[in-house]
Amino acid sequence: FYEFAHLMTYDEVYDLLEKCFGDRMIAEYILENSRKLGEKFTFYSLERKQMIPKVEVKDYPKSWKWFSEGNCRYPLIRELCFSDNIQERYWINECLLGLKEKNLYKTEYLARIEIEADVIKYIGEKLDDCLFAYFNTFKHYIDLFWECGSIVGPGRGSATGFLSNYLLGITQLDPIRWNLPYWRFLNKERAELPDIDIDLAPSKRPAIFEAIRRERGPLGLVQVATFGTEGTKSAVLTACRGYRSDDYPDGIDVDVAQYMSSLIPQERGFLWDINDVIYGNEEKDRKPVTAFIREMKQYPGLLEIITSICGLVNKRGIHASGVILYGEDPFETASFMKAPNGDIITCYDLHKAEAAGDTKYDFLVTEVSDKIIKCFDMLHEDKVIQNDNLRDTYNKYIHPEVIDTNDPAIWEHLAAGDVLDVFQFSGGVGLAIAKKLKPKNPLEMTAANAMMRLMSEKGVESQQDRYARIQKQGIEVFDYEMRQRHMPEEIIEKMHNHCDTYYGCCAIQEQMMEILMDVAHFTLGEANNARKIVAKKQMSKIPELRKQVYDKMQNDIIADYVWEIAVRPQLGYAFSMNHSLPYSFVGIQTIYLAMHFNPIYWNTACLIVNSGATDEEAGGQTDYGKIAKAIGDITSSGIKVSLANINKSGFGFAPDVENNQILFGMKGMLNVGDDVITAIIENRPYSSIKDFYYKVKPSKQTMISLIKGGAFDEMEDRKFAMAWYIWETCEKKSRITLQNMPSLIKYGMLPEDTEERIM
């Protein structure tokens, strides 16, 4: 087979046909027919322009009701109000309605709407589609997410900078109040479809997907396929697994293969390319790995196998967040297959799907959303808060606009690290940076959120250390530093303007872009390209970017400083301001829930989610290992988790406010099934272990687990409970034999005068 598995020449095909049929005339006839068929082929392409999924929207009448008749200060707003396109009329009316409801009907906000509408319309015309429909579709599904019982996060990524997204309820932060750059999301220099990311609750995403499919059809929502490739390490392991030679007929030992793969260096989270491992790379200051080369020489041909399979597709999977919404005929642009877990996914990966005309939506998940939902559920159940719908409850208590961020208690808790699972600040790095920088407002928390991800080069002051140093010594230190480096007054003023908020640091993507535009004379498009190179770690393009900065500046002293302050710190992993600020507000929400209500509710919610028990009543499998780890983590924080209580415990963990502890859930107990738990709850209360036993009639394994797990401790001593159960259920012996005597003597169960009686 492999002998013929290549594109043959005319002569090769002719010779094979002649050998096959033994007749030159037949071979010539077949080739002639093939040529005629080839002439009839019609070229076609699967590529087409991307189509924006549409949803039905309210048909607002053509009207100028929002303004006086003579008001023409906003010509595009007026044009949209009278547009023949229902999607355009809906978008502008919903935005203006949002301004009214939020008491933001002001010149500055109307002017921003005019700007954003202009950008959306311009890009839509370039793409030959109504781009306003993209936002209307997103608004429709945001409303659906809330109806399905999921929290929708305050924002994620650059979309937070667009005022219209805020007014439509897609995001929750006023970008004008927080000075978030709208051009970071959409601008005329980048005429492409926007990319809005949404954070949902993991436990609710399946229900959300089903709701969308009910609305759009079984293939109305399909997750995007991914195709994994052989990386440097996996290529080594794969090659070793299949390697055979005369000297090694049984192949290479697994331990040896693991050792060889461990020799592949890693830098800034990326494995070296196999060519860099073997030959080095002067541009990246990489030297050949001698130990790896030595191992390769022991196995002739192994290196050739590794280099030939590096980068080849070796598996398929499901995109973490990407979904595509299809219309009436999904097969117009797509074909489908099943993922390893059985879910239907696209046959194309993301880039090919978009090239075929599909539009991706990103529906991500964060566990903190489940924790907030669980916390609200328990507060509702205990009647601590009113039983409103989830969206109203969220808006009433923890919407970013209702939390008083001037409350010093929030920042004291953040710095102290005494609130469990503060979003983005619960790990060792997050706790350390919160204690080190001690943020006192959302912007400072945003800086801390961004800086914890920046990796500094060896021997270079980290951004966290620089921030803490200048925060302590005063911003004058930053000014003195620039003057010592002989920066012109104009540059000093601009750098103060961009960096003073963060104490002379550049930890935010937009900061770097603004400095490059303002100081290094980059265009918006060039600055955005620089951001992509840095954010996506395109290390091969860094030298080219550095040269561009120096060429633009035409002053090496200033260029050195701009590169050192604005670009080099972000080569690790920088956050966008439009992303970091809403994420900081999620952290604030978690602190607020723990301090505004009894913290036992928040702590219990964290334990439920961390133990994987979010759907404790759904009959799912119990992961005892995960539960044990979650309990260990939470008790190490000084939070008490009590044993199960037969009269109080439910399926999952529950807050015991009276005793300020978390009550263990019975679903986490071995041999205690869902049906039994349901029966236990339905037959309460129980006055004794005997009362329980005859009401529920559990199996032997279940009863022993409940006794050993302490479920009856408030009623009876555990040993007495077990003894009663054995006495009550085991068949009584009418006589004993000599075989029983050793046990009777051992446990002292014979009368004291037994020996005298026998004698």
What spans do the regions from the language model cover?
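Alpha-helical scaffold/interaction cores of sigma-54-like transcription cofactors
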Residues: 1-759
